[in-house]
């Protein structure tokens, strides 16, 4: 099956504005609400209380119930960790998520988020890999928000994404018949404070 350009991206998370606060939630169509069927739990309980059921069957059913409860708990823990990570990203990039201006992205690496949430860097990497977030200004890939920092002429640390954006703007505005040389690009970016 070939890729179709008009395929929609279904986000994993949603960021919304509530006054000055940014709210983060899971996109519920992507996550199932899991629970153990109440009538099945009652059947297991009744079987455990029954003297007519052999010990091996009772143990088997108890083990299956415990496994199901563990699975539901693990999924809830995973969702909780995912939300903590994305909330930390939104907090670190508050201005960007509020305004949607790429120039407001601050340098941020996986380690920053991992330390803030209290998880391993690999956990943050797995949570943000191939995950999308819907924002008031569009849907974006979470990993694209992570950038290294570069110190500009004023001594401020800025995101390398800001510099990439500035280069793209300069190249878009140049005469395509006579593109800028590398030295000219450096001079133009230097004039802009980079």
Which residues make up each language-model segment?
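Alpha-helical scaffold/interaction cores of sigma-54-like transcription cofactors
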Residues: 1-194
């Amino acid at each position: 099956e070939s890729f179709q350009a008009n395929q929609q991206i279904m986000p994993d998370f949603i960021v919304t504005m509530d006054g000055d606060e940014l709210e983060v939630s899971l996109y519920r169509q992507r996550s199932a609400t899991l629970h153990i069927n109440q009538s099945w739990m009652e059947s297991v309980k009744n079987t455990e209380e029954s003297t007519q059921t052999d010990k091996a069957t009772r143990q088997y059913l108890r083990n299956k119930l415990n496994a199901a409860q563990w699975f539901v708990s693990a999924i809830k823990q995973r969702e909780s960790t995912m939300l903590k990570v994305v909330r930390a990203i939104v907090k670190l990039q508050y201005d960007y998520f509020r305004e949607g201006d790429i120039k407001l992205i601050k340098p941020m690496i996986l380690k920053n988020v991992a330390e803030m949430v209290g998880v391993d860097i690999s956990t943050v990497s797995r949570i943000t890999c191939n995950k999308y977030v819907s924002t008031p200004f569009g849907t974006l890939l979470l990993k694209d928000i992570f950038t290294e920092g570069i110190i500009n002429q004023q001594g401020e640390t800025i995101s390398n994404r800001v510099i990439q954006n500035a280069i793209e703007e300069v190249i878009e505005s140049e005469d395509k018949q006579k593109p800028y040389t590398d030295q000219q690009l450096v001079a133009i970016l230097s004039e802009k404070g980079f």
